[in-house]
Regions:
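Hydrophobic beta-strand residues in large extracellular and virion-surface proteins
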Residues: 4-8, 40, 71-73, 85, ...
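Short, conserved beta-turn/loop elements at beta-strand boundaries and strand-helix junctions
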Residues: 88-94, 330-337
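Well-ordered beta-strand positions in beta-sheet-rich domains
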Residues: 79-82, 100, 114-116, 202, ...
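Beta-strand-rich assembly/attachment modules of structural machines
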Residues: 1-129
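Acidic, small/polar-enriched beta strand-loop surface segments
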Residues: 2-7, 171, 199-336, 350-361
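Charged- and aromatic-enriched interaction segments used to assemble
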Residues: 94-220
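Oligomerization/assembly interface segments of phage tail-like spikes and tubes
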Residues: 30-50, 96-108, 229, 282-295, ...
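Envelope-exposed proteins and targeting segments
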Residues: 36, 81, 97-99, 187-189, ...
Length: 361
């Protein structure tokens, strides 16, 4: 059982109150190179009584409002999730009125921001920070994110793009060969890593045993071994490239994809992006998810990006799930007492390279 606090924060970055005791059906998640997520329900009458006692009774939206207030979650005294409120939902019945709260991590703010990028021979972590800093300097655009630290090696890159959405720019730069991971922490620091997380040979989960349940698909539905990259421009004037993998074509036939990057003006950048798509989509896809319960895994001791040992026993079709996998996402359901059900999703793409980078830290 963990001790949780669900803190509402003001737009001027001040804590306003803890509402965990009101939360029902709470769920939070963290995903590598993506936004945190948080959702929960409250009984509207209890909620309004509570904030009235705090001095917010005349206008409930003065305490918590969509788009304005942040919610930060503490677990055992440590901040684990930082989000901005995106949506309230209201549902009434004969017994009660419930308000659902949905909040998403700070990275999703940059889904609504666009910049023009011109960088030459620049460290990729500086390029990433540069687009956020550009957003900060626009009128009404300073979301409070500040630069944190970089861990690991540095790679120099060129980037020239027009009116590019910032979130996808950061994610695409993380996916190219030798791209770096990134995160925005609950206190709004932008950190970059050669490879986020730690190599954890001491941590091992098996089914049956520590793993309560698991699921995964093995699919070629989204496989592509020929990728046509289309950049800025119209028709034949557009910047274009093609990359392919003959080994994959021989194994599972030719499978094509068009990847559009309308803001990309340089062929080198376009080829890097198309090659990244090919790398991650040329083979049948498996992303094992496991669920652990009743404290079988200490969330204080594991995080997104960590590499741990996973083994599924009992059936020949599962025997290949036996080795080191990297945690891509952590999703946690929390009851009113702090009991948790934890779901981890993994992949093993480039796992030996990831381990070597994590061991070097």
């Amino acid at each position: 059982m963990a001790k949780y606090e669900v803190e509402v924060w003001s737009k001027d970055n001040k804590p306003m109150g803890d509402i965990f005791h009101l939360c029902e059906n709470m769920r939070w998640s963290k995903t590598r190179n993506d936004a945190d997520m948080l959702s929960f329900d409250v009984d509207l009458t209890r909620y309004e009584e509570y904030i009235k006692a705090m001095g917010f009774g005349d206008n409930p939206k003065s305490f918590m409002e969509v788009g304005r207030n942040d919610i930060r979650v503490k677990r055992n005294g440590r901040y684990i999730v930082g989000t901005n409120i995106i949506k309230f939902g209201y549902k009434g019945s004969s017994s009660a009125v419930k308000m659902s709260v949905n909040a998403s991590g700070y990275l999703n703010y940059y889904k609504k921001r666009y910049v023009t990028v011109n960088y030459s021979n620049k460290p990729q972590q500086d390029i990433m920070w540069g687009v956020i800093d550009t957003c900060n300097k626009m009128a009404g655009g300073d979301y409070g994110v500040r630069r944190g630290r970089h861990t690991g090696a540095t790679v120099l890159r060129d980037r020239n793009q027009e009116r590019k959405e910032v979130k996808s720019f950061l994610q695409q730069l993380s996916q190219v060969s030798k791209g770096c991971d990134f995160e925005i922490t609950p206190d709004k620091l932008f950190n970059t890593y050669e490879a986020q997380g730690y190599y954890r040979p001491d941590m091992r989960l098996e089914y049956p045993g520590d793993i309560a349940s698991f699921s995964f698909d093995r699919s070629v539905e989204n496989v592509a071994n020929v990728v046509y990259g289309i950049g800025s421009g119209n028709g034949e004037d557009a910047v274009q490239t093609k990359v392919e993998d003959a080994t994959s074509q021989q194994a599972i036939y030719r499978r094509e994809m068009i990847a559009s990057y309308n803001s990309v003006t340089e062929i080198g950048t376009l080829t890097q992006n198309a090659t990244a798509v090919l790398h991650y989509s040329k083979d049948p896809i498996e992303l094992p998810s496991i669920t652990v319960e009743n404290g079988a895994l200490d969330l204080s001791d594991v995080g997104v990006g960590d590499t741990i040992y996973i083994k599924l026993n009992g059936n020949k079709s599962l025997q290949h799930i036996d080795g080191y996998y990297r945690i891509e996402s952590i999703s946690v359901s929390v009851d009113n007492n702090g009991w948790e059900s934890v779901e981890l999703t993994f992949d093993d793409i480039d796992i030996n390279d990831i381990i070597s980078k994590q061991e070097a830290v």
